[in-house]
């Protein structure tokens, strides 16, 4: 608390009060709770990110009656996980959104079913993708109506050692969608932020090509030095620390050296 009086978090999160428990979204509430898409989330404790256990499009025949929600986008009053200040202010960088694409498809249809649909070239895969894109483009417009410096997109694409799908399939099926979303943001004069956990080395060149200004990734599992060798100076990295080993077991001096090494490798 003392340091926050002198050094504010760069997105201004500490200017917002914590979200009251009664206002937690469905995926952060204990028990089973339904979100605006009709996905039912299950969590064992309040504040613990839950799992989607009932997916409205697990049976594709339900798609004919599925209704896409119309979410309002308003300046946030509270913070939870990642707060987003609105408005130009020297005290913070105003970054809006946490807009997912592949992850929302999984929550609606199911992880295995989405991948199987794509692999087999099912009409359902293209229908869900195209409608998901239309939904997200409309959502981006709502964020662009507010005063932000950048818009944040997020999809976890990596496992510990590789992409979840082949880079070629990612480029043919998903890349055009990211292109459309990123172009809308960039043409409005805003920065594009993209979050993706896991090993995503294969698509970092694509994200840079598409205009991502900031990539929030886990460079440790890809090799910090190799990520820096290939991409240092081409994009801003907002990288994760080594939570699996150093941040869990390392002594203070080891942690300090780890952080310094990240700046040397990627900064």
Model region roles, listed by residue range:
Residues 2-22, 142-148:
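Catalytic domains of carbohydrate-active enzymes, especially glycoside hydrolases
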Residues 1, 43, 65-267:
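Active-site loop segments of alpha/beta catalytic cores
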């Amino acid at each position: 608390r003392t340091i926050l009086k002198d050094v504010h978090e760069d997105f201004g999160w500490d200017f917002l009060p914590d979200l009251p428990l009664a206002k937690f979204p469905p995926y952060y509430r204990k028990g089973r709770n339904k979100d605006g898409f009709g996905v039912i989330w299950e969590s064992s404790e309040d504040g613990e990110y839950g799992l989607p256990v009932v997916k409205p499009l697990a049976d594709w025949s339900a798609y004919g009656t599925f209704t896409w929600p119309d979410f309002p986008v308003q300046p946030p009053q509270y913070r939870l996980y990642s707060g987003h200040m609105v408005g130009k202010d020297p005290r913070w960088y105003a970054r809006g959104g946490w807009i997912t694409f592949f992850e929302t498809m999984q929550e609606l249809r199911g992880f295995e079913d989405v991948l199987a649909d794509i692999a087999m070239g099912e009409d359902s895969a293209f229908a869900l993708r195209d409608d998901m894109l239309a939904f997200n483009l409309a959502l981006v417009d709502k964020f662009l109506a507010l005063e932000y410096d950048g818009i944040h997109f997020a999809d976890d694409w990596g496992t510990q050692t590789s992409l979840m799908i082949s880079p070629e399939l990612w480029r043919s099926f998903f890349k055009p969608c990211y292109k459309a979303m990123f172009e809308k943001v960039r043409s409005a004069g805003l920065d594009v932020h993209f979050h993706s956990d896991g090993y995503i080395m294969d698509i970092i060149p694509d994200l840079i090509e598409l205009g991502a200004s900031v990539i929030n990734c886990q460079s440790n599992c890809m090799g910090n030095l190799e990520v820096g060798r290939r991409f240092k100076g081409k994009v801003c990295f907002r990288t994760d620390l080594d939570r699996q080993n150093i941040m869990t077991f390392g002594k203070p001096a080891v942690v300090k050296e780890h952080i310094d090494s990240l700046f040397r490798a990627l900064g």
